[in-house]
Amino acid sequence: MKLLVLDGNSLVNRAYFGIKLLTTKDGRYTNAIFGFQNILLNLLSAHHPDAVAIAWDEKAPTFRHTAYDGYKATRHGMPQELAEQMPVLKQLLTDLGFVQVSKPGWEADDILGTLAAANEAAGGTTLLATGDRDSLQLVDDATTVLLATNRETLPMDPAAIQEKYGVAPPQLIEV
């Protein structure tokens, strides 16, 4: 099975910051919803997956917060204009039949890695769509990261990572 897993938080942030603020006639913000849908439709059209899952972060602290007090301490909260769009986007995705996955104490990255490993164990291949370069360490012969950049989505397989960084994917954690 070819599984496409989207890092929802990463991609919705790219959509939000990549498109000027759009609103409905009654003033509701829609730019993140519009941009995320475009990203999703482009991925579906380009890759024709057998199954799709969208992973989301939860607000609950993770084990990383317990291990390191400063984990993401300098991150700013979600802009209010984006926060207002999140329930609408998630409901739209539910209404369209997309599986959405989140778990308290887990980040979307953790879910991406877990789903990729489970799908690989079942004999499948996985595409991980994200703008987070940390996910590149998950790449192997059965898992490709579709790395969202400012202009394009780059398919990052083991050969592409070796060429760009000069190391194998598991070694990226040391770079």
Predicted feature locations:
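Short N-terminal helix-initiation segments at or just after the protein's N-terminus
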Residues: 64-66, 72-75
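NTP-dependent nucleotidyl-transfer catalytic core
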Residues: 3, 47, 58, 70, ...
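Non-catalytic, usually N-terminal nucleic-acid engagement modules in DNA/RNA processing proteins
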Residues: 1-53, 57, 63-67
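Conserved nucleotide-binding/hydrolysis micro-motifs of P-loop NTPases
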Residues: 10-11, 59-62, 133-135, 151-152
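Extended two-metal-dependent nuclease catalytic cores across DNA- and RNA-processing enzymes
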Residues: 22-23, 73-175
